[in-house]
């Protein structure tokens, strides 16, 4: 079950999704369940407006020369105590700047704060937060 929401209005867009997963396990192991949700608000700082892509079922790639600001939040609960799996609960807040060089390439600068807790994975701390800054050139296929 993964309901999605997409609203496009001029140079603003809102995306959100809830996801749920159930893994049937064999040999007497209990089924594993995980779930989460994310939300993204995006706006074109330079560029005219967003369009909908029927082929991609989402926001179309903005025009060449567009500069986009994206704010996002993600929550994922990969721990299922009934199944005996404590893979962690993650909260991630991020801010991204995308510059669309052409219709096939973009430059991206992204900051993310990620907090993970409630995990019991070998060689990993049970609680951790990470600040990440990344820059990349991305080819869109």
Model-found features: residue ranges?
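Outer-membrane beta-barrel pore domains
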Residues: 1-141
